[in-house]
Amino acid sequence: MDFSVIIPARYASSRLPAKLLKDVHGKPLIQLTYENAINSGANRVIIATDDKRIETVANDFGALTCMTDEHHTSGTSRIAQVLEVLDIDNDEIIVNVQGDEPMLNPSVIDQVANNLATSSMQIATLCEQITNKEQYLDPNCVKVVFNKAGKALYFSRAAIPFFREAKDFDLKLCFKHVGIYAYRAWFIKQYLTMSKSSYEQVEKLEQLTVLNEGFDIHVAPACDGIGHGVDIQCDLDKVRKELN
């Protein structure tokens, strides 16, 4: 199975400025993400950035880079520009790996690519079991509900599924979305033609527009650890501690 990994790597970050260049035991954060991706089964890994500083650092550790516009509003639109610049075939499988996921296991990247390749759905993504009630109630933790065929029914920042009777509360039914996606190049291009749904506008979740347009998203529990993503300083501290 052939697939490419594209890592959107935006320089600006309001909560942790220049986070992708933060040092983690002698390496910039983006390099850790890249190394995990290069150790997957991907044919190639491309870092899509909007900043010369990231491009220079990435080139120094041997990465293939593609400069993109600084005004993209999502990683998906940044990836679409890469597809155009590099003239990537419409049927190629693309895995979108966020640049701030330095502990993402390579096997998880392979899993989501394979799930798309063996499914009739247009997107594949992953989830993890929610382990405590605080996480279940946290609006920063995106929840997903899916059917027995792995088809996403809804994504929400709200606590879903809702347990009408307190005695029925069961974390085994609760899953958080993991923000890694696989899709074919043609679908990324088509996504950019979609108008944002009302659900995306209120929840700030772009995958809701995909569901609203009638496309299917395959969801499966991740086969291995996802680790800490880095949004704020305490996340970076956790990564440094775990990798020490």
Swiss-Prot record:
The keyword Transport does not apply. Pathway: Nucleotide-sugar biosynthesis; CMP-3-deoxy-D-manno-octulosonate biosynthesis; CMP-3-deoxy-D-manno-octulosonate from 3-deoxy-D-manno-octulosonate and CTP: step 1/1; Bacterial outer membrane biogenesis; lipopolysaccharide biosynthesis. It catalyses: 3-deoxy-alpha-D-manno-oct-2-ulosonate + CTP = CMP-3-deoxy-beta-D-manno-octulosonate + diphosphate. GO terms for molecular function: 3-deoxy-manno-octulosonate cytidylyltransferase activity. GO terms for biological process: CMP-keto-3-deoxy-D-manno-octulosonic acid biosynthetic process; lipopolysaccharide biosynthetic process. Pfam families: CTP_transf_3. Activates KDO (a required 8-carbon sugar) for incorporation into bacterial lipopolysaccharide in Gram-negative bacteria. This is 3-deoxy-manno-octulosonate cytidylyltransferase. It comes from Ruthia magnifica subsp. Calyptogena magnifica. The gene is kdsB.
